[in-house]
From Swiss-Prot, chain A:
Gene giving rise to this polypeptide: SPO11-2
Disrupted-gene phenotype: Plants show a semi-sterile phenotype and a drastic decrease of meiotic recombination, indicating that SPO11-1 and SPO11-3 are not functionally redundant. SPO11-1 and SPO11-2 are both required for double-strand breaks induction. Drastic decrease in chiasma formation at metaphase I associated with an absence of synapsis in prophase, due to the inability to make double-strand breaks (DSB).
Domain Topo IIA-type catalytic: 24-167
Name this polypeptide is given: Meiotic recombination protein SPO11-2
UniProt-listed CDD domains: TOPRIM_TopoIIB_SPO
Known EC number: 5.6.2.2
Localization, UniProt: Nucleus
Catalytic reaction equation(s): ATP-dependent breakage, passage and rejoining of double-stranded DNA
Active site: Y124 (o-(5'-phospho-dna)-tyrosine intermediate)
SUPFAM superfamilies reported in the protein's UniProt record: DNA topoisomerase IV, alpha subunit
UniProt keywords, alphabetically: DNA-binding, Isomerase, Magnesium, Meiosis, Metal-binding, Nucleus, Topoisomerase
Name of one Pfam family that matches: TP6A_N
Source organism: Arabidopsis thaliana
From Swiss-Prot, chain B:
UniProt remark on domains: Despite a weak sequence similarity, retains most of the structural features of the ancestral archaeal Top6B subunit (AC O05207), including the transducer domain that interacts with the SPO11 subunit and the ATP-binding fold, also named GHKL fold.
Protein name: Type 2 DNA topoisomerase 6 subunit B-like
Organism: Arabidopsis thaliana (Mouse-ear cress)
Localization annotation: Chromosome; Nucleus; Cytoplasm
GO molecular function, one term: DNA topoisomerase type II (double strand cut, ATP-hydrolyzing) activity
Annotated keywords: Chromosome, Cytoplasm, Meiosis, Nucleus
Deletion phenotype: Defective in meiosis. Sterility due to male and female gamete developmental defects leading to disturbed embryo sac development and abnormal pollen formation. Strong reduction in bivalent formation at metaphase I caused by defects in meiotic double-strand breaks (DSB) formation. Impaired homologous chromosome synapsis and recombination.
Amino acid sequence: MEESSGLSSMKFFSDQHLSYADILLPHEARARIEVSVLNLLRILNSPDPAISDLSLINRKRSNSCINKGILTDVSYIFLSTSFTKSSLTNAKTAKAFVRVWKVMEICFQILLQEKRVTQRELFYKLLCDSPDYFSSQIEVNRSVQDVVALLRCSRYSLGIMASSRGLVAGRLFLQEPGKEAVDCSACGSSGFAITGDLNLLDNTIMRTDARYIIIVEKHAIFHRLVEDRVFNHIPCVFITAKGYPDIATRFFLHRMSTTFPDLPILVLVDWNPAGLAILCTFKFGSIGMGLEAYRYACNVKWIGLRGDDLNLIPEESLVPLKPKDSQIAKSLLSSKILQENYIEELSLMVQTGKRAEIEALYCHGYNYLGKYIATKIVQGKYI
Amino acid sequence: MENNAPVPKLLLQLISSAFQRCRLAEDLCRLSVLLDQSTERDPPITCISIADTGIGCNLEEFQNLRCPREFNGAKIWDGLLSVKTTCFTDDEVYYYHINLDEYIANKRLKRQPSQAKNGAKFSGTEVSLSVFGSMDVLVAPIIGFFQKIIVLQILNVTLDLMVKQGTSPGNQTQYVFAVNADKTPCFTASNLERLKSGLEDYVLRHANCLDTMCDYCFSDREHLKVGSGTVCQEDKHKRVGGTMEVVIVISDLLESTQHCSRSCNGKTEVLYFDNFLPSPVPHLALSALKKIDWKKYGLILANVNDQDGHVFLEWDNFPSYVQIQIALHWYHNQYPTRQKNGPGISLLKKGIKNALDNLKAKHEGFLLSSHSRKICSYVPDLARSIAGLIFSSTDLDFQGDCLSVLGFQTQEVERDTVENYIQRKIVTVIGMNERKPQKDQEAAPFLFFDGESETSFFEDEEVEGEYYSSSLE
């Protein structure tokens, strides 16, 4: 089935059907929950009683659209206005329906106390209260996203924090309100942890003399680059999300990109479809959290690894693509969001059936990584 | 014993006729059966008398009666019925001998001298006969028949059975079958009302084996859930129309039931009445019972046990403390009629279905399909969360709005009350949705938006590898 791609000639208006989650204050979020309770009760106790269905913004690929920026260089994925229906009387959705109300109940209490909890904490709370409904973190996360899609307010607005995995290091000073500034070049090789508190991130003052922001897929590579203080040679800030980026790390990067709009953001990932998918999550946002992720899309550039780096890598370091890789590749190719040269790279991966990890560059010595990045920057080889 | 089998059948036919004569009389009537076994003879002879004070008989009813003199090589009776009958307007009591063994019509009936009534005004009939053998095999079928007849609660007829063995008064037993006095519908109640009340009694009194309600099983009638359905068939092309009435009683027995001698094993007895008389369940009714979509009512029919029209339904996964009792009654709109057409299968099915739906409508959350029962199992948790949302709020306006929407007056109402109310309400809606025909099931309103956008079904499983997944940390 042909997906609606949003690639119409009316590009200015391509996002007019954008659905989004508002960022709300606790009392505003509470008010939305209260309205949903009242609506439910009203319909339940009306002369023609019914159990209201939950209309959730569809978080499927079929409801995703792409906004290709014309006036800006940022493109992003957003969710359009199709809904899914979660109904108590449908066997398929009955449990999910109850889960939504359970999550709303807990969020309501959190909001009343003006506290914030992580999804992990939420999971344990729900596991204790309602073990019949929540058996895994995934179920909790999905229900949280259902509540986001129902109330159309961001997860953070519900009092739920993204427990961030993000780290930052290099030529950046961060000053949280009422605290002393932190020098991210002096935090050791483990870097400075990005908080999951989006509000705090929003109020943090940032200063830098860096010329580049470099995102590294893997924690080990981040660690190597920071330990070698590569940011002394290349004036830059390193960020890693240790894999697929959480919302807080994306939020942080987006904040940096708007604070320092002239700094190019370069991404160093493995040469495999998953690496490209991670890059794309920074670049375009994601469908799963599509109601809020689109806000944090940044125009990142792909610095490596890429097909023309393969000559730097010994043949034996190339390993065959896994079935999961092929799946991701297929999904990416059909997404219609990739620019031409990304498609070429992806096709090359599929064609050769091989993948390569950044660590393969260590065959030239541990300090080669810094030189590799420097060379790429000097030659302007990022796409 | 077996060689006497035609006799009980003949007796029940005679009793049935007598009962109909009583039923059609407008007055209070009595139907007495006497079994008198002489102890001096070997083999014993039992004299039988069936006497009623109903309208007089018209002899036609004996036309088709048959009963062989011998059965399995043994002589069972002399083939002779003696009948005395008189109508209210008659001046005398007519007396006949009817030889059931005679197939030539005019030799069959022999009129005997009549007796003058001397101006007395009464009506009635007495049929007597003598059979060889002990009366033991006759008592049980007659009692069983009477126990069923009184389910119909035909109030103007009293039934009794006298069993005599020899002349000594110590060897006499009298059984009286009367309608239970504690909740008797009035004379003008409809047939259906009486059948309902009668079937309730039948259950409470253990198939009418007891004189009063079984205290072990029931503390009161509230343990019974009753549903009824009626379907009428119009008169058509000289065919006399009829009415199909179905009553279903479900009893939630008490835990103490296990102390009770009668155990139902969760089986369902089906009583069938044909024109006000207990009758074996006909094949069409059996097929109808098999064709009912029981799953719609959360029941799984495991087996239909048919022993010569005595039918039990057996269920799968059925709680043993719940008992279902079904009574079907088919009668012609005109009576008496020579026609003997029974109800069609669709009429039977419709009647049973109506009764089930009626029961379901009257008792919230009862007889729900397994699907709805599963959904209902989530409702307490859902209600708890919603009540939690209302009562954890610090916003008194919001709380007040919620309570007033639910129809509670004061702010002082307890959380449990509200929670229970919400729970009951949701279960009611689930039950209502189930009763609506599929095509009438409109989509439930959305919580926020009026669903004008394209909607699709919620898929619970995220598609693996679809695009790149978002981090759900």
